[in-house]
Amino acid sequence: MRTLVRRRCLLVALVAVAALLAGREIARAQSNESGDLSIELVDPKVLRVCADPRNLPFSNDKGEGFENKLGELFAEKLQKKLDFMYFPQATGFVRMTLGAHRCDVIMGFPQGDDLAQGTNPYYRTAYALVAKQGSGLDDVDTLEDARLKTKRVGIVAGTPPATNMAVNGLMTNAKPYPLMIDTRFDSSAEAMIGDLEKGEIDAGILWGPMAGFYAKKASPPLHVTPLVKETTGPRLAYRIGMGVRAVDQNWKRQLNRLIQENQPAIDKILLDFGVPLLDENDRPIGAESATKSP
């Protein structure tokens, strides 16, 4: 009888240990499925870039954006094939692309955004005022300028400079454009520049890369002034790096090295697209920086 009891106790103990181990394996599997991975899953042979299919000057599915060109540069340096995973850059973009392991890097990602882990920044720019040459507004360099009080100024609703406009009493005559759109069908930047060319607004405020790109395409070209002299409201200049998954530490370090080693080539690509680049002292970075060796 005692022997039988001992055997049963031993069996119960073994079952308990097996259940504990199985529970740990299940928990580990569930953790992995939720994205909390302990290993990096970066494709070793293909540079898989998360991108928007219609969001120039950043990217499009024809490979015409500067993030497309940066992808080509990095793929060449990494000696990898290049593949773009396209998804509209709106709510859910990071979750459905990088978070779903369908790609391994977002080429443009603001510092301080906690949806992904950022690399070192590779450019710095600011929101900018866009106006016609000779309009009397092409020398305005701050939203505190009294000349804007009576002007109709375009602004993308919900962006930081909207706060600066409100502080300076410019919202009465403002024309708002939507922030959250499906980029496959609409572009607030294109609509704003179109209204500026037609005279429906006197000036517009856009994120630097968009301002520079569309101003350069206009006929005649429009004047772009980075807004770096604001003393009221939020700052309007930001650093942009690349976004990777939080677990991909080695991948982040590899991208950081590539950014450092190829900064002049990166600057040249950005300048070719009209991006108003700024150094840390808010001074413009010109084409001469793109000719210097790293």
Where are these regions (language model features)?
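Alpha-to-beta junction loops
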Residues: 79-81, 99-108, 150-152, 192, ...
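Twin-arginine (Tat) signal peptide motif
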Residues: 2-11
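Acidic, polar ligand-binding/catalytic clefts
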Residues: 72, 76, 81-147, 158, ...
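Extended ligand-binding regions for polar small-molecule ligands
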Residues: 31-32, 65-77, 134-137, 141-160, ...
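Periplasmic-binding protein-like
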Residues: 52-53, 124-136, 216-259, 273-294
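Bilobed "Venus flytrap"/periplasmic-binding protein-like clamshell domains
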Residues: 53-57, 61-76, 129-188, 209-210
